[in-house]
Amino acid sequence: MSDYTQQLQDKKDHLKTLFAGLDVPEWEVYESPDKHYRMRAEFRIWHEGGEMFYAMFEKGQKAGGASLIRCDRFEAASEAVNRLMPELIAVAAQSAELRNRWYAVEFLSTLSGEMLVTMIYHKRLDDEWMQAAQALQQQLDTSVIGRSRGQKIVLKQDYVTETLKVGNRDFRYRQIEGGFTQPNAAVCQKMLEWACGAAEGLGGDLLELYCGNGNFTLPLSEKFERVLATEISKTSVGAAQWNIEANGIGNIKIARLSAEEFTEAYTGKREFARLKDGGIALTDYAFSTIFVDPPRAGIDEETLKLVSQFDNIIYISCNPETLRANLDTLVETHVVERAALFDQFPFTHHIESGVLLKKKIL
């Protein structure tokens, strides 16, 4: 058994143990490539003896020489990131402006090889730095952002555009520097396919909480009459609106509300001008399904009460422990019809999963 297969088996075993006692069907398993799967990568820049190189540190240890791991290559990162890593450090090393007090770097890439590089400094970035960075950007044919305390200098653009294939259609996504995106694009496509399969035939309208940049929203919109999606981050809402327009989708509306705020609006406890200003009347919708992709903490108690009111629930989770806790409540009213493991993060303990629940027929 390969190292990859073994770690995936360990995750399956963990889920079976964690969800023991719940009536959960056989877990569908979606594998990742075993290398070059991460579209994002972050490194410290380590300066030593006149040389500088990419570095990480041993987990759980203080960053320093004793825990230092030199990273000339990083097999988990996309091939585009690995190609650019030696070129970037070689060019930057030739410029005092780029080299001096360069502290860290973040790479954001796409399946097509588009790249955004954020160079983080412990100094104020001035015109001389900008000139050197523009020359580097042109030489490497990439987009560069400079960051320092209180500074963000965008030389060309602060996003990449990813294209993900779901079924027979390509969806374009603007991914903003610093915004949340699924790091494993190959597995993300499998997650989108699974979610669309889970939604097949449900009909009616869809409510989505925690929609981010519209990652799931866009392909799911093809399975429902109308979609109302909520997200609290202004950056993510802006990206989602661009993504909706860029893909020519006309049945999605975005409300900039947290899950807790939407629960208050839906139950009539509070009125929000943001809904009215967006031309959103909750009474216009006939929701058959709710889609949730919450943060690691899972769904809060009040929102969970709201979720349990829907006939169909599609729940994507980045934390199986909080999913288990939420399911302990949801199985009082619903049955788990499908369950899936998505190996978004190979060779780590992190597990991404998804479940489809349908209301019990009493």
UniProtKB/Swiss-Prot annotation:
EC number, as in UniProt: 2.1.1.-, 2.1.1.35
Top-tier EC class: transferase
Gene Ontology molecular function terms on file: rRNA binding; tRNA (uracil(54)-C5)-methyltransferase activity, S-adenosyl methionine-dependent; tRNA binding
Keyword Ribonucleoprotein attributed: no
Keyword Membrane: no
GO terms for biological process, alphabetical: tRNA methylation
Catalytic activity, reaction form: uridine(54) in tRNA + S-adenosyl-L-methionine = 5-methyluridine(54) in tRNA + S-adenosyl-L-homocysteine + H(+); uridine(341) in tmRNA + S-adenosyl-L-methionine = 5-methyluridine(341) in tmRNA + S-adenosyl-L-homocysteine + H(+)
Stretches assigned to coiled coil: none
Active site: C318, E352
Protein task: Dual-specificity methyltransferase that catalyzes the formation of 5-methyluridine at position 54 (m5U54) in all tRNAs, and that of position 341 (m5U341) in tmRNA (transfer-mRNA).
The family this protein is said to belong to: Belongs to the class I-like SAM-binding methyltransferase superfamily. RNA M5U methyltransferase family. TrmA subfamily.
Protein name: tRNA/tmRNA (uracil-C(5))-methyltransferase
Organism per entry: Neisseria meningitidis serogroup A / serotype 4A (strain DSM 15465 / Z2491)
Origin organism lineage: Bacteria, Pseudomonadati, Pseudomonadota, Betaproteobacteria, Neisseriales
